Swiss-Prot record:
Belongs to the universal ribosomal protein uS13 family. The keyword Lipoprotein does not apply. Residues 94-118 are annotated as: Disordered. This is Small ribosomal subunit protein uS13. InterPro entries: Rbsml_uS13_C, Ribosomal_uS13, Ribosomal_uS13-like_H2TH, Ribosomal_uS13_bac-type, Ribosomal_uS13_CS. One of its GO terms (molecular function) is structural constituent of ribosome. Located at the top of the head of the 30S subunit, it contacts several helices of the 16S rRNA. In the 70S ribosome it contacts the 23S rRNA (bridge B1a) and protein L5 of the 50S subunit (bridge B1b), connecting the 2 subunits; these bridges are implicated in subunit movement. Contacts the tRNAs in the A and P-sites. Part of the 30S ribosomal subunit. Forms a loose heterodimer with protein S19. Forms two bridges to the 50S subunit in the 70S ribosome. Pfam families: Ribosomal_S13 (PF00416). Keywords: Ribonucleoprotein, Ribosomal protein, RNA-binding, rRNA-binding, tRNA-binding. It comes from Vibrio cholerae serotype O1 (strain ATCC 39315 / El Tor Inaba N16961). GO terms for cellular component: cytosol; small ribosomal subunit. The keyword rRNA processing does not apply. Gene3D superfamilies: 1.10.8.50, 30s ribosomal protein s13, domain 2.
Length: 118
C-alpha cells in the first residue's frame, strides 16, 4: 500500500479513485493532479513505480489536505462563533445556517425531539 499524506492509499483501485481516499481531494482535484503529472487515470496504484508515487506525494503536498484542512475548517467555524455574526450564532445553536425552515424539518441539524415537560 502506498502512503500519501499520512493515508494508506488502496492498491487495487484506479489512481483517480484511490486519491479520493485523502480528505480534501475529490474526483476533480484527483484528475487535475494526475493530469499535471502525466499519469493515466486508469492506472492502478499497484502498477505505479516508486518514482511516480513520489511525484504523487509532491502533487498532493501542494494542496491543503487531511489534518491541516480539518483544522482550517474548524478554525473558520470557531472564528464565526467568536465574531457573534448570524452564521456563528446558528452554529452555536446547532441550527441550519442558510435560511432553511426550522418550524418543521431540520431534524438532522437539531437532533432528536426533546419532549415538553408538563
Amino acid at each position: 500500500m502506498a502512503r500519501i499524506a499520512g493515508i494508506n492509499i488502496p492498491d487495487h483501485k484506479h489512481a483517480v479513485i484511490a486519491l479520493t481516499a485523502i480528505y480534501g481531494i475529490g474526483k476533480t482535484r484527483s484528475k487535475a493532479i494526475l493530469a499535471d503529472l502525466g499519469i493515466a487515470e486508469s492506472v492502478k496504484i499497484s502498477e505505479l513505480t516508486e518514482e511516480q508515487i513520489d511525484q504523487l506525494r509532491d502533487g498532493v503536498a501542494k494542496y491543503t489536505v487531511e489534518g491541516d484542512l480539518r483544522r482550517e475548517v474548524s478554525m473558520n467555524i470557531k472564528r464565526l462563533m467568536d465574531l457573534g455574526c448570524y452564521r456563528g450564532l446558528r452554529h452555536r445553536r446547532s441550527l441550519p445556517l442558510r435560511g432553511q425552515r426550522t418550524k418543521t424539518n431540520a431534524r438532522t441539524r437539531k437532533g432528536p425531539r426533546k419532549p415538553i415537560k408538563k
